[in-house]
């Protein structure tokens, strides 16, 4: 059973996904069921800051052409210790063509951005095909490359909007690095390069890694 604070319960609808349960498929399923113009992605054990959605609303009123608003993300360990910030480089001079905005060239040179916590226009997300479940490890990078390649406008709001817990036990990326789905460095590099190639295609082409082929 799920319990919510007073005033929140009536605004919560639990939707059961009876299909594929990988991260990308679950997000895509969730987006398909959304009836609002915008949506956001909240991962397990992560937190929005108290000011985040107020800031999004404020920036929406000034930047009508933006289709994705990313937060500055506070990355912490499972013990709650500070690791680093993410999504903030767009506010560094000369990082991208336009201060505060993410573009394709900037992503090619600096891939470390996160999608969780962001607020997305559903139409923009759907128009480029959403997440690709066949892309392992670098599916976030591939999506952002694809969105910027197809000229979707992505802005980082210069406020701390999201706290992300890294490497939670049995989480997807924990398993990629430590668990049953562990990805070795050679495969990780292959998926990174594949993300840069697949971003030109809106559809998920069902890419698969062949370890034998890579060692020949």
Where on the chain are the PLM-derived regions?
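Acidic donor-binding loop at a coil-to-helix junction in glycosyltransferase catalytic cores
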Residues: 136-143
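Short, flexible, basic/aromatic active-site loop/helix in glycosyltransferases
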Residues: 88-110
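Acidic donor-binding segment of Leloir-type glycosyltransferases
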Residues: 1-18
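Short aromatic/hydrophobic "clamp" motif used to bind/position activated sugar donors
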Residues: 39
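Catalytic beta-strand/loop signature of glycosyltransferases that borders the donor
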Residues: 72, 155-161
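Conserved donor NDP-sugar-binding/catalytic core segment of glycosyltransferases
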Residues: 51-87
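Catalytic core of nucleotide-sugar-dependent glycosyltransferases
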Residues: 149, 159-168, 173-207
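Glycine-rich, basic loop-to-helix element that forms the pyrophosphate-binding segment
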Residues: 17-34
């Amino acid at each position: 059973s799920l319990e919510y604070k007073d005033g929140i319960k009536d605004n919560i609808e639990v939707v059961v996904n009876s299909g594929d349960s990988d991260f990308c498929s679950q997000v895509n399923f969730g987006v398909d069921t959304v009836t609002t113009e915008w949506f956001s992605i909240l991962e397990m054990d992560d937190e929005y800051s108290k000011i985040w959605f107020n800031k999004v609303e404020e920036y929406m009123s000034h930047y009508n052409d933006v289709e994705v608003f990313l937060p500055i993300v506070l990355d912490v360990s499972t013990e709650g210790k500070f690791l680093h910030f993410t999504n903030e480089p767009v506010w560094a001079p000369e990082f991208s063509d336009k201060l505060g905005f993410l573009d394709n060239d900037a992503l090619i040179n600096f891939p470390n951005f996160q999608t969780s916590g962001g607020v997305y226009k559903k139409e923009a997300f759907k128009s480029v095909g959403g997440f690709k479940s066949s892309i392992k490890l670098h599916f976030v990078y591939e999506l952002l490359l694809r969105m910027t390649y197809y000229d979707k406008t992505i802005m980082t709001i210069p406020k701390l909007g999201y706290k992300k817990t890294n490497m939670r036990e049995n989480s997807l990326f924990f398993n990629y690095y430590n668990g049953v789905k562990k990805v070795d460095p050679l495969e990780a590099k292959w998926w990174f390069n594949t993300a840069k190639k697949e971003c030109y295609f809106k559809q998920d082409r069902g890419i698969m890694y062949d370890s034998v082929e890579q060692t020949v």
